[in-house]
């Protein structure tokens, strides 16, 4: 019996024990993120975005955040984590109308669309913080993100590089989830 990709993803999410879900992909972990409870772990990349902002003392509370991307892996969970930090969040995607204008309204822009070089200078303004979550192999064979870094970096206050930005912190978050899960298991 062949399963469709979407059906296969659902099956995998349901088959994994939430106690062993370090990257927030099970329905139980997702529910905990959406409900704001501590029952599971948020997806590591979404948690990495929030951790980066906090590490660099970038205010989140009351800030306008635009998230480009609506996936279960990054777009939706990072939006909910930022809402929990009292940000005002707008979720957009590659087909959102007037996307550059919406992006320029943000204090913090999270680019997680899965399209290499989708966001350039036309979509940003001075004073913004940009978290580039994408990772792709460019036409030149080098890694690149969802932003056109060389265009965006001179305009904004701060931007995460690709490689060496969000992905690096994602690995650290995963390790912290593994340690926390081991501690939980040891205390049961």
Predicted regions and their residues:
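Short, conserved aromatic-histidine micro-motifs
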Residues: 100, 185-188
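Short glycine/serine- and small hydrophobic-enriched flexible loop segments
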Residues: 2, 51-54, 176-183
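Single conserved hydrophobic/aromatic residue that forms the stacking wall/gate
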Residues: 1-7, 11
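Glycine-rich phosphate/diphosphate-binding loop of Rossmann-like nucleotide-binding domains
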Residues: 31, 37-125, 129, 144-147
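Structural motif
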Residues: 2, 17, 57, 101, ...
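Glycine-rich beta-alpha junction loops
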Residues: 5, 72, 95-96, 135-137
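Rossmann-fold NAD(P)-binding glycine/threonine-rich loop
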Residues: 9-23, 27-30, 134-185
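Short alpha-helical patches at coil-to-helix transitions and adjacent helical residues
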Residues: 4, 46, 168-172
């Amino acid at each position: 019996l062949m399963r469709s990709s979407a059906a296969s993803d659902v099956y995998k999410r349901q088959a994994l024990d939430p106690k062993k879900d370090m990257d927030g992909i099970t329905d139980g972990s997702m529910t905990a993120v959406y409900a704001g409870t501590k029952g599971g772990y948020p997806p590591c990349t979404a948690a990495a975005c929030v951790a980066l902002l906090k590490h660099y003392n970038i205010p989140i509370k009351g800030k306008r955040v635009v998230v480009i991307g609506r996936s279960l892996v990054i777009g939706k969970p990072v939006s909910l984590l930022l809402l929990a930090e009292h940000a005002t969040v707008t979720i957009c995607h590659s087909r959102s109308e007037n996307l550059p204008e919406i992006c320029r309204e943000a204090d913090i822009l999270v680019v997680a669309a899965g399209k290499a070089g989708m966001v350039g200078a036309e979509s940003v303004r001075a004073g913004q913080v940009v978290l580039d979550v994408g990772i792709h192999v460019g036409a030149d064979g080098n890694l690149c993100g969802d932003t056109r870094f060389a265009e965006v970096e001179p305009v904004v206050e701060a931007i995460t590089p690709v490689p060496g930005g969000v992905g690096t912190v994602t690995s650290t978050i995963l390790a912290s989830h593994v340690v926390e899960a081991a501690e939980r298991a040891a205390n049961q």
